[in-house]
């Protein structure tokens, strides 16, 4: 009979299309799916495609008013995960028309929305996303990008050095500014507000901005180098956030900061637009990422959050260290470091890269290595991250036995020694300790730092493995 046939039918009849040839304009997703016992992988994969696009649990007569074939997500390939009993990588293609232009918020609401609470799945993780140029071109991306940042700062041929001001909470604005000045004066390029420093009773944002600006200008005048402090503009409302960004702009400082996951993608994209229009660099902190990305079988992998940030906009983003106190398995970390910086990234499953990604001319983002790192890590960091990165030593600067400025000196000397050694063709991985030891002979500050941290090890097995 012709017409509407009510009732529940299997998702795979509509949404599992193994013969589908993906289009250049499709957004492609790779999900790690753990079905409930008794649910076949084809049905689970089709359910993911359906629930994250046009489907619902039963046939509805309004399906007849549109062309499902044009708008539905399609599960086009399924492969079992090696070494796991009941896990599959499910590939889904979404037609571009399902998404609003220039909105990470809308893209995520579909792809990682309700489907994650779906009962037929025991767990679901979004491992990777291919954003086609047709979609990425609808975004502004980072306010400035790597090359423009180097030109603004007049710093070339080496990683940039930063430091998070500690104790993260409790300092008055004046003492905070003093710590900023000492670090910048000692040789760092940047200092940083901690991610949870917004505007609390012990230090209101306006006071902090003023004292930090004073510190920046004083350090610049004395060193002849351009300096910056990531002024955290994150706030409870977008209007308040913009007000803080405005004040930073009026002070003439080079860079501000945002917590993009807690602040949200809508706020972040607005701030990135503001920064481009006002010539401010934007540093992005990823507080809350581990809630989303740390479980191996459920959530969203950080490489997807990193791609989303490059679309939404930011000039720096924290990306793990490989060697410090926070997560980061080497190959996987390098995978999303390349994805943040480069125009083009080949599919490479050994790095967890499921799709070839072509960013066309979207500016790049500097990866920030931060968390439990100190001078002995400098050779490894220089080798792993290369020149286009920011190396941030919080405790590794402020924990120096002689104080903040000598801590900054130690880090700058160590970095310059590593860069020089690398440029001379030496092997940082093999000769790193020797390079640091030699440099410490003519730098008492570095020598003292080497002594303090020579025994420190923060080794646990990485959770983020393939």
Curated annotation (Swiss-Prot):
This is Ribulose bisphosphate carboxylase large chain. The basic functional RuBisCO is composed of a large chain homodimer in a 'head-to-tail' conformation. In form I RuBisCO this homodimer is arranged in a barrel-like tetramer with the small subunits forming a tetrameric 'cap' on each end of the 'barrel'. Its cofactor is Mg(2+). It comes from Drosera binata (Fork-leaved sundew). RuBisCO catalyzes two reactions: the carboxylation of D-ribulose 1,5-bisphosphate, the primary event in carbon dioxide fixation, as well as the oxidative fragmentation of the pentose substrate in the photorespiration process. Both reactions occur simultaneously and in competition at the same active site. The record marks 325 as: Transition state stabilizer. InterPro entries: RuBisCO, RuBisCo_large_chain_AS, RuBisCO_lsu_C, RuBisCO_lsu_C_sf, RuBisCO_lsu_fd_N, RuBisCO_lsu_N_sf, RuBisCO_lsuI. Coiled coil: none annotated.
